[in-house]
Structures are given as C-alpha cells and as structure tokens.
C-alpha cells in the first residue's frame, strides 16, 4: 500500500531534476536560467550550450516522464478506472515537478513538452507517434519549436482519446495541454510580435 503513496512523490521529485541546469553547469560556465529565454529545457540549452547538451537534456527530461509512469503501470491495472486515475496522478506529478522543480525553489522550471512526451510514451504510444509527426511537420513548415510544441499540445487530448477511449487519460491530456500553453505565454507573445527565434537561419 505504501508504494501507491510513494510513487507520486517519487515522480514529482524525479520530475524536479533540472537536467538542463545540471548539464550546463557541469560542462560550461553558463547558468542557463540567465541566458537566452531563461528556460532550463532542451531548446534553450541547445541554443546556448550546443546540440550535444541539448540532446542530453532532452533525453533526461523525457525519462523523467517515462520512468515513473512505467512504474505506475506495473503497480496499477492500466485498463481499470482506478488504475487510470493512479497512472494519470503519477504522470501529472512528474509533469508538475518539471514545471515547478523543488530543487530550484519552484522557479524557472521547464515548459513541460519533453516530460509530457515521456509520460504519454507509456500512456498512449500511438498518440505520441501522431504528435511527433505533427511536431516535425510544424518545425519543417514554420521553423519554430514553440509553434510545433503548441500544435502538438493542442492535438494531445484528441490523439489520446482516439487511441485509448479513456475519459480519465484524456482528462490528464487536457490538463497537460493547458499547462503547456500556460508555460508558453511568453512564446505566444513573441510569436504575435514576430520576434520568436527561428531554428535555422
């Protein structure tokens, strides 16, 4: 019984690990929170510290979602109502940790896209495949990560519903998408002003 209560806490603490900040401090003299967009996620790390550290950050942030949600599916029955509620709770705990990391005083967290991808890689792999294709399409079309992230987030609940038919898991996807949009408010403002950075020049 104790593991049912400990896993959401573990998910939050794991989700709180600021890999972007850790990698940039280990391998450079940069504090990523004060460079570029100030975000600790993979996109800003890649822009400021290079693609290798950006890729390491991306993998670390994805695993923050994969590991606890996979453990949740091992504990709870994925096709059971209470199992779906528990899995969603664990996923949202990991996602919340990434957004509001306790280790850096709940400030300067990431925008949630990579950790959400890790969560839904376990919850709904087929939905994630569709969202990755949407992400790639928008990156190639508009050359901006923020637009691709927002487009994928908008389609997340639809893709999860189509794949799983679960109201609980779709609700988890809706909450996730709303927070991703909330964390991208500055990007949306820059997009409207025409100042959002492009990927390739």
Regions found by a protein language model. Give the residues of each.
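N-terminal signal-anchor transmembrane alpha helix
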Residues: 2-27
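Cytosolic, membrane-interface loops and tails of multi-pass inner-membrane proteins
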Residues: 21-52, 108-109, 185, 189-201
């Amino acid at each position: 019984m104790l593991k049912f209560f400990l896993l959401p806490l573990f998910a939050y603490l794991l989700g709180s690990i600021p890999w972007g900040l850790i990698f940039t401090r280990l391998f450079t003299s940069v504090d990523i929170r004060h460079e570029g967009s100030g975000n600790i996620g993979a996109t800003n790390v890649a822009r400021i510290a290079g693609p290798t550290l950006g890729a390491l950050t991306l993998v670390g942030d994805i695993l923050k979602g994969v590991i606890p949600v996979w453990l949740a599916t091992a504990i709870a029955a994925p096709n059971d109502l209470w199992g779906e509620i528990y899995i969603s709770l664990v996923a949202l705990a990991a996602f919340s940790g990434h957004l509001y990391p306790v280790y850096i005083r709940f400030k300067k967290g990431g925008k949630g896209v990579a950790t959400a991808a890790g969560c839904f890689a376990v919850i709904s792999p087929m939905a994630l495949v569709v969202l990755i294709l949407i992400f790639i399409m928008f990156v190639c079309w508009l050359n901006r990560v923020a637009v691709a992230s927002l487009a994928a987030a908008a389609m997340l609940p639809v893709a999860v519903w189509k794949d799983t038919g679960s109201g609980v898991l779709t609700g988890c996807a809706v909450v996730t998408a709303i927070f991703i949009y909330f964390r991208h408010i500055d990007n949306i403002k820059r997009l409207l002003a025409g100042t959002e950075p492009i990927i390739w020049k």
